[in-house]
Amino acid sequence: MSVMKIPGHVNQKPGEVMLEEIENLLGDCKRCELGQTRSHLVFGTGDPHARVMFVGEGPGKNEDLKGEPFVGAAGKKLDSLLSIAGLTREEIYIANVVKCRPPGNRNPKPDEIEACSPFLREQIRSVWPDVIVCLGNFASQWVLKTDRGVTQLRGKLYQQGHFVVAPTFHPAACIYHSDWQPLLEEDLARVGAWLAANPRGEVTAAAATAHNVRPVADAAGKKTPAGAGLPEEAAR
């Protein structure tokens, strides 16, 4: 699926399409069945020029009620761990693969992910972060265009054009699997080390080598999820 074109902004460069315009284009979205059952569409929030963008799976009950991402228990868990990467909530941008809560917190369906994909892709294109932290299976598989699970993907950084991608566990999973939290902390520390060594605007190929950043091909699986993938400019 190609980059979605915002009306009136077909020649915009990365970082020039405003998040507000993308949200307005979403409107009262009914592009899939989730639009019939949600309370609120949950677009995304945070610093529109963040160096680090977090991508989760989808809204939970609290997020659906408030219309904001990561405001429930998983959000509190994430907030408590951000300092490991040298970050605060105010310094990041955060969004989800799907914008509406799947009923009963079930997994999002392929057609639901595909319906939301152009909008997530444009959010990434607007923020144009240096690092994308993928929280859980669905975010990791979408960004890295693979069917491999996060347990196989985590523990490494991947280079995808402009972006460094860090797959890790979803903080909600760590609430129920406490033995996964040290691994999430390890992954966030890896992100923090990369950020400290690579000031914005000074990222080099040598830095990627020094931090053992893997080519995105190392994440490849047997199947690409429907609608998955970063903006086309990422490969340039």
Segment roles from a protein language model:
Residues S2-R236:
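A polyanion-binding, active-site-adjacent surface
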